[in-house]
Amino acid sequence: MNPMLNIAIRAARKAGNIIAKNYERRDDIITMEKGKNDYVTNIDKASEEAIIEIIKKSYPNHTIITEESGALEGSDNDVQWVIDPLDGTTNFVKGLPHFSVSIAIRVKGRTEVGVVYDPIRNELFTAVRGEGAKLNDLRLRVENKRDLSGAVLATGFPFKQAKYMPMQFRMMESLIQEVADFRRTGSAALDLCYVAAGRVDGYFEYGIKAWDVAAGDLIVREAGGIVTDYHAGHGYLKAGHIVAAAPRVLKEMLNKIQPCLAEDLK
């Protein structure tokens, strides 16, 4: 096994165990608002600390970028670990059992390893660039649909930037003319993994951060899917908007999404 993948899996499982254990102890969860509609808990921080400790033991010089602590610069900035210690914090706080740990390893700007762990279902999604994607020991391939007919799409709402909600509804109104239904699960990392696993046929969202999608992005691509931003480009880790699906489905999604974009995103 790729040695960095091994460490990423170990870190994700350790963090997942902390999250799952505390999910059952609701009175011990301390929630703080770090921005409008944006929450962090003591469990996010405990999960993050566990991940950082495991990475630093094996790779003390690597840079670590996390949702809660920002960038922890190492002497080797070519290797960056991009971490969301609890993707789906709102679900966790509300007692909805759908959240994950997301860890990506980027080397010289290219994602080489992706790990997403769902501690409630004990599902471990992994990918190594050029080696495919897996769910536990099962190889993943995207559902190779030819068009949007009958498709189920995952999405998220721009709850931190409400001015883009009309755009979101325009996109959904356009897509629903072809697709069967939508799902809004509250974990971008798992939405991407579900595209890779064929559980949903595509995913689109505005308002994501790099740590939300860096691991899931590689998992989709290694499962044979395509990931772009709303302009069909590859700047989604910085742009904050993302589309993922099998090739033909993605093309049709973009054809529906692009005419609906807000003026400042065109």
Model-found features: residue ranges?
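Short, Asp-centered acidic motifs that coordinate Mg2+ and/or phosphate
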Residues: 63, 113, 152, 201-202
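Conserved beta-strand termini and adjacent loop/short-helix elements that scaffold enzyme active sites
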Residues: 34, 67, 185-187, 230
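Residue-level detector of anion-binding/catalytic polar loops
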Residues: 18, 61-63, 181, 201, ...
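Residue-level signal for inorganic ion chemistry
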Residues: 19, 44, 55, 89, ...
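Oxyanion/phosphate-interacting regions
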Residues: 1-10, 170-177, 190-266
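N-terminal subdomain of lithium-sensitive/metallo-dependent phosphomonoesterases centered on the IMPase/IPPase/PAP
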Residues: 1-86, 248, 259, 263-266
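Acidic beta-strand-loop-alpha-helix segment within the catalytic core
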Residues: 104-192, 239-266
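Glycine-rich active-site/cofactor-binding loop and its immediate structural neighborhood
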Residues: 77-121
